């Protein structure tokens, strides 16, 4: 690891990303700030772990955080199982190849989604229901989209903590 982070900064939509950020803070001893709080608390270019929720493989507000801070690792929290979609998320987010990326499964709470995001999930559900010969992953995803679920777990932090404590 080139630069050790000195804080965790996050943005959360339904609370799952906030919970992961706080779990990481609990395991590392790093202070944790919501993005708007961080602007008052942290100087520019502070090395941080940034955590944001995933939407269409893009980590919410990553670019905003990267303009202000030195993002030394990125955690994207979304629907996909932990450790999946790394290539897609890196590309959609515009994350440099040398920056460690971790995806963490958060879950789904349709009622907690605001604005256009709920409508987008409804559209995704309708699209997936029309799919002929869905895979097991498709079926599991559709079930989660419809029924909801919470998968935030300390167990999902293995790769993040391994990276943090390396060297």
Where are these regions (language model features)?
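FMN-binding flavodoxin-like domain, especially the glycine-rich phosphate-binding loop
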Residues: 54-167
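N-terminal beta1-alpha1-beta2 submodule of the flavodoxin-like/Rossmannoid cofactor-binding fold
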Residues: 1-68, 158, 162-167
């Amino acid at each position: 690891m080139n630069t050790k982070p000195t804080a965790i900064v996050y943005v959360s939509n339904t609370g799952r990303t906030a919970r992961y950020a706080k779990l990481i803070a609990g395991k590392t001893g790093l202070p944790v700030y919501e993005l708007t709080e961080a602007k008052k608390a942290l100087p520019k270019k502070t090395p941080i772990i940034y955590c944001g929720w995933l939407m269409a493989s893009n980590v919410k507000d990553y670019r905003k955080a990267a303009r202000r801070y030195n993002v030394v690792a990125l955690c994207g929290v979304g629907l996909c199982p932990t450790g999946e979609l790394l290539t897609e998320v890196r590309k959609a987010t515009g994350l440099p190849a040398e920056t460690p990326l971790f995806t963490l499964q958060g879950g789904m709470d349709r009622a907690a989604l605001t604005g256009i995001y709920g409508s987008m999930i409804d559209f995704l559900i309708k699209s997936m229901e029309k799919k002929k010969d869905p895979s097991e992953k498709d079926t599991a995803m559709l079930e989660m989209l419809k029924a909801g679920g919470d998968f935030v777990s300390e167990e999902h932090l293995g790769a993040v903590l391994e990276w943090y404590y390396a060297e």
